[in-house]
Amino acid sequence: MIFKVFYQEKMTEVPVRENTKVLYLEADSERDVRAKLKKFAYNIEFVQSVTGAHLEYEKQNADLKLTEIV
């Protein structure tokens, strides 16, 4: 499943909408997404699963590039 993750790069700063970044990640669950991103110390605001029509929309209208985490 593909997830869209909204996050701030620094955990110590107050989230500001204009600084929110997005990445796409393939994972089994939201818990798996958070576990994979834990080592980066991002301030994760929201994790959204992207499927069906939403996935097709993201492919057409956004820079949908899956982030690979080793």
Swiss-Prot record:
Query: In the UniProt record, which is one GO cellular component term?
Result: DNA-directed RNA polymerase complex
Gene Ontology terms describing biological process: DNA-templated transcription
Which keywords label this protein? DNA-directed RNA polymerase, Nucleotidyltransferase, Transcription, Transferase
- A Pfam entry, by short name: RpoY
Q: Which InterPro entries match?
A: RpoY (IPR009907)
Under catalytic activity, the entry for this protein gives: RNA(n) + a ribonucleoside 5'-triphosphate = RNA(n+1) + diphosphate
Tell me, what is one Gene Ontology molecular-function annotation carried by this entry?
Answer: DNA-directed RNA polymerase activity
| Enzyme type, top EC level | transferase
EC number(s): the record gives 2.7.7.6
Would the keyword Transferase turn up in this protein's UniProt record? Answer: yes
Biological role stated in the UniProt entry: A non-essential component of RNA polymerase (RNAP).
How is the quaternary structure described? Answer: RNAP is composed of a core of 2 alpha, a beta and a beta' subunit. The core is associated with a delta subunit, and at least one of epsilon or omega. When a sigma factor is associated with the core the holoenzyme is formed, which can initiate transcription.
What NCBIfam families does the record point to?
PRK13667.1
Its family? Belongs to the RNA polymerase subunit epsilon family.
- What protein does this entry describe? DNA-directed RNA polymerase subunit epsilon
In its UniProt entry, the species of origin is given as Bacillus cytotoxicus (strain DSM 22905 / CIP 110041 / 391-98 / NVH 391-98)
